[in-house]
C-alpha cells in the first residue's frame, strides 16, 4: 500500500489504456472500437448536474463549490473516513451550510485525497485535474492552496463557464436529476 506521504507529491499519470482490459486481444478490440466512437457526441443518460448551472451559465464560484460540495461520491467517501459533512460544506437537512469557507473545505479534501486511491472517483478526478485544469501533481495538503488558486483563476475565464465546458466535451444530451441530498425529483433532460 502506498503511503500518504508518497502520494502527497505524486505526479498524475493517465495511462492511455487505463479503462481497457489487460488481456492484449481484448484490449486491441477495445482500442479499435473506441477509435471509431471517441468523437461521437456524448448522450449521457444519467448525471447529477443541476440543470440551473447550464441554463444560467454563470462562472463557477470556486473549486469547492464546483467539485466537492455537489459531488456525493467525494463527500461520502470522506464521510466514510470520519470527516464531518458539515466541514465539507454539505448543507444540513434544513438547508443550512455550516462551513462556508471554500479554502477550508478544499484543504480538507486535498489533505485526504490519498483516501481515493484505487477508486473510480480518483480516476475521474485525476482526469479532471490533469486534462481539464492542467494540474500535474496530485492534490495534497502540501499543494492544496496552489491547486485551489490555479483552478480558481481558470474558473474566471469564459472557456470555463458551464456551457463552454458542455460544448468542449461534445455533450449532445445530458439527463440529470437534483443533487443527492435533496428530495427526489423527476429527471431533467438538457440538450443542445
Where are these regions (language model features)?
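Alpha-helical scaffold segments that flank or form the walls of functional sites
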Residues: 38, 63-181
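Conserved small/polar residues in nucleotide/adenosyl-binding loops
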Residues: 182-188
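A very general structural signal that marks isolated residues within well-ordered alpha-helical segments
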Residues: 53, 188-189
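An N-terminal structural lobe/cap that precedes and organizes the functional/catalytic core
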Residues: 10-93
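Short, Lys/Arg-enriched N-terminal segments with co-localized hydrophobic residues
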Residues: 1-8
Amino acid at each position: 500500500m502506498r503511503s500518504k506521504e508518497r502520494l502527497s507529491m505524486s505526479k498524475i499519470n493517465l495511462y492511455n489504456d487505463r479503462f481497457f482490459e489487460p488481456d492484449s486481444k481484448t484490449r486491441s478490440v477495445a482500442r479499435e472500437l473506441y477509435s471509431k466512437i471517441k468523437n461521437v457526441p456524448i448522450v449521457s443518460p444519467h448525471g447529477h448536474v443541476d440543470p440551473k448551472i447550464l441554463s444560467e451559465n454563470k462562472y463557477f464560484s470556486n473549486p469547492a463549490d464546483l467539485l466537492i460540495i455537489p459531488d456525493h461520491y467525494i463527500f461520502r467517501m470522506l464521510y466514510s473516513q470520519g470527516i464531518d459533512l458539515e466541514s465539507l460544506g454539505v448543507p444540513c437537512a434544513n438547508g443550512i451550510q455550516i462551513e462556508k469557507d471554500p479554502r477550508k473545505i478544499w484543504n480538507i479534501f486535498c489533505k485526504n485525497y490519498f483516501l481515493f486511491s484505487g477508486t473510480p472517483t480518483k480516476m475521474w478526478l485525476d482526469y479532471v485535474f490533469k486534462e481539464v485544469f492542467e494540474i500535474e501533481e496530485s492534490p495534497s495538503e502540501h499543494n492544496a492552496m496552489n491547486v485551489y488558486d490555479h483552478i480558481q483563476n481558470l474558473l474566471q475565464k469564459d472557456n470555463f463557464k458551464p456551457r463552454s465546458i458542455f460544448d468542449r466535451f461534445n455533450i449532445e444530451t445530458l439527463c440529470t436529476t437534483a443533487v443527492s441530498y435533496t428530495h427526489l425529483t423527476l429527471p431533467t433532460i438538457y440538450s443542445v
